[in-house]
């Protein structure tokens, strides 16, 4: 393999693909990137066996070939090179030389036939969707997935594609995020996808591109003309999230998002490190915050709000509320609840978007 390539393009491609390379692995080749020539230039691929990413960049190819190269070291070298063309020459299957200006490096690699093949996915049955729509769904839901291994099904994001809409849902059993947007395609289905894979999709594909998506036996593949992302799917039935979303919450508060965030951050300073419990007391035009943590101290605050309903005291994990508010797209939020032990919802108020967004959070029991 012998080729010349732009340093900027090479660094951009390496940075894109290196995110799929595991930090630690018992299989040495997974710490490498696969470099191989194509009709269009150079293809760079990386995988951790659950997620695979590949991208193609233009290159002046003198002779074809391929090799795997240590991902971290190659990226570190290219990052420090001067702004000049980079020449790559592979000697056999396990050595590659790199030259840029007066800089010269040699790295030991592994044969490309040791690199795992990407899953077989037939794009003849693919469907298309705007990348920006997928990014919006991911960006507003993936934060809510569970990080505990006791319920693996909750470690993924549910993606539902229906007749007139597509939605993503994520939950850890204590909080939930759901977004749906109009969809005009003919494909219908649902998948549970690891958030790490969705983060690569959100990061790598420009919002104005159209994504082509196809399903393999147990994988989902996303591709544009030059980049592909493959993800292993999480198997099993997703919980019936719809039945836990309350329809009859009759207490409604409209609250300035930034003011609510600021008050919760102040309360978090003296809240318990275990429960992060904050007591919220809603009245006609006032929201009172209070925290009491044994062996630490107390805190109180007040906020002017618009409120409809009887007064209520209700406890929440303040960190869950702060995380939800971080993804709320409007300056004002609609906060609804019914009883101190029932689920509460947060939605953007006066959101002028075609998307619909709802977050749910379960309350905490208040203790005297």
Give the label of every model feature segment.
Residues 1-368:
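Structural preference for solvent-exposed beta-strand-turn elements
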């Amino acid at each position: 393999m012998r080729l010349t390539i732009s340093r900027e393009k090479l660094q951009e491609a390496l940075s894109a693909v290196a995110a799929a390379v595991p930090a630690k692995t018992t299989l040495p080749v997974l710490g490498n990137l696969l470099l191989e020539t194509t009709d269009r230039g150079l293809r760079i691929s990386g995988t951790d066996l659950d997620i695979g990413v590949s991208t193609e960049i233009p290159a002046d190819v003198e002779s074809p070939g391929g090799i795997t190269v240590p991902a971290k070291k190659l990226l570190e070298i290219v990052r420090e090179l001067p702004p000049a063309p980079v020449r790559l020459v592979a000697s056999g299957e396990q050595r590659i030389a790199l030259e840029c200006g007066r800089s010269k490096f040699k790295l030991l690699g592994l044969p490309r036939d040791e690199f795992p093949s990407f899953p077989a996915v037939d794009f003849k049955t693919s469907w298309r969707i705007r990348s920006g729509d997928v990014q919006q769904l991911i960006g507003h839901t993936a934060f809510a997935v569970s990080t505990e291994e006791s319920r693996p099904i909750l470690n993924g994001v549910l993606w539902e594609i229906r007749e007139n809409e597509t939605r993503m849902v994520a939950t850890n059993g204590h909080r939930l995020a759901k977004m749906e947007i109009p969809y005009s395609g003919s494909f219908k289905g649902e998948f549970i996808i690891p958030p790490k894979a969705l983060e690569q999709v959100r990061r790598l594909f420009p919002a104005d591109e159209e994504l082509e998506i196809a399903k393999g036996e147990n994988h989902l593949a996303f591709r544009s003309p030059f980049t592909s992302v493959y993800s292993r799917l999480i198997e099993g039935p997703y919980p019936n999230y719809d039945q836990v979303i309350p329809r009859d919450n009759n207490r409604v508060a409209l609250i300035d998002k930034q003011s609510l965030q600021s008050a919760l951050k102040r309360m978090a300073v003296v809240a318990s490190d275990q429960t992060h419990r904050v007591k919220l007391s809603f009245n006609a035009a006032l929201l009172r915050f209070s925290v009491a943590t044994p062996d630490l101290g107390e805190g109180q605050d007040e906020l002017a709000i618009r409120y409809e309903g009887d007064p209520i005291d209700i406890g929440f994990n303040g960190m869950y509320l702060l995380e939800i508010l971080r993804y709320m797209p409007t300056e004002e939020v609609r906060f609804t609840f019914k009883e101190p032990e029932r689920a509460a919802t947060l939605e953007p108020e006066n959101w002028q978007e075609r998307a619909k967004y709802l977050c749910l959070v379960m309350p905490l029991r208040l203790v005297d």
